[in-house]
Structure formats: C-alpha cells, structure tokens
Design a protein with these regions (language model features):
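Conserved alpha/beta-hydrolase
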Residues: 72-96
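Alpha/beta-hydrolase active-site loop
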Residues: 101-122
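Alpha/beta-hydrolase fold nucleophile elbow
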Residues: 124-136
C-alpha cells in the first residue's frame, strides 16, 4: 500500500527524507539529439525493479516537478525515467530566456521522445513492463506516441491531457 506524504509536515518530509533519497539514486544525463542540442533526463534505477515508468511533464514544467511522484514510483519498485522536453528545464532551447518556452513544431517533442525511448529507455528495460505517466502537454505527447508506437508501453496514465 502506498504511503502518502503527510500534509502536516510535508515540507520537512520532502527536505529530510524524500529529496536526500532521490539525490542518492538520481542519475542525470544529457542525451544528444539528432537535431542538435541535448535532452536532459533524470534516471532512477534499482536492482529489484519490477516495472519501469516514463514521466512526461506539462507545458513550462520540468522533470523536477515530479520528484514526489518519483518517490512513490520508486517505493513501488519502478525504475523511473523523466525528461525535460526541449525548451523546458535543462534541455536544449532556442531562446536563452528561461521564462519563455518555444518549440518550432510539436513533432519535435515526438521525435525527442522516440530518440529517448530508443536510446535510453528500451535498452535498459527490455525485461520490464513499461508504463507511461504523462501530464498535460506531456499527455498530448504521450497520446500521440502511443498511437505511433503502441509497443513502447503496456499501460498509460494521462493526467489532464
């Protein structure tokens, strides 16, 4: 059964328990993209994982927003793979002002996810069922990717797509 973080001392539990645990497990990577630049990812792997989840964030967000969800997934024996979409977080961007998000075409997001899946996720999760957890704009990216590549994921949860 999943133990939800308490509201009464949420900030303290995140700072004293969750963040140190995630920091000890997080592998950050910058994957080169075929179109230039890099896609930033946070990878959390554990030897006793029984499943894998790919997390796709929403517009103007980044993988960092889903650290609490990452904690829950890790406690449920998932390996976690979370990216910063292009123009977001630490990934390639065309505009230096980090308060502005820009992408030339929505298909860029789809291609980036395909490259992340083929270059990072699929080789590391051949033996695990994969789940997609995608929020808002990430849900749109995930939904279109599911249509094009149903073999990527056994299940999907799209929140506010």
């Amino acid at each position: 059964m999943i133990s939800i973080l308490p509201e009464s001392n949420y900030a303290a539990v995140m700072a004293e328990t969750v963040e140190p645990y995630l920091d000890s497990r997080r592998q950050e990577m910058d994957m080169p993209l075929s179109t230039g630049g890099t896609l930033h990812a946070e990878v959390y792997e554990q030897p006793d994982a029984t499943r894998a989840v790919v997390i796709l964030h929403g517009y103007t967000e980044s993988a960092e927003k889903f650290r609490e969800m990452t904690w829950y997934f890790l406690n449920e024996k998932f390996n976690v793979y979370a990216i910063d979409h292009r123009g977001h977080g630490k990934s390639v961007r065309k505009i230096s002002d980090t308060s502005i998000t820009h992408v030339d075409a929505f298909s860029d997001y789809l291609r980036d996810l395909e490259e992340f899946m083929s270059g990072v996720v699929l080789p590391r999760t051949e033996h695990l069922p994969r789940v997609l957890y995608a929020h808002s704009m990430g849900g749109a990216i995930g939904g279109m990717t599911l249509m094009n590549h149903p073999e990527y994921f056994a299940r999907a949860a799209l929140t506010a797509p």
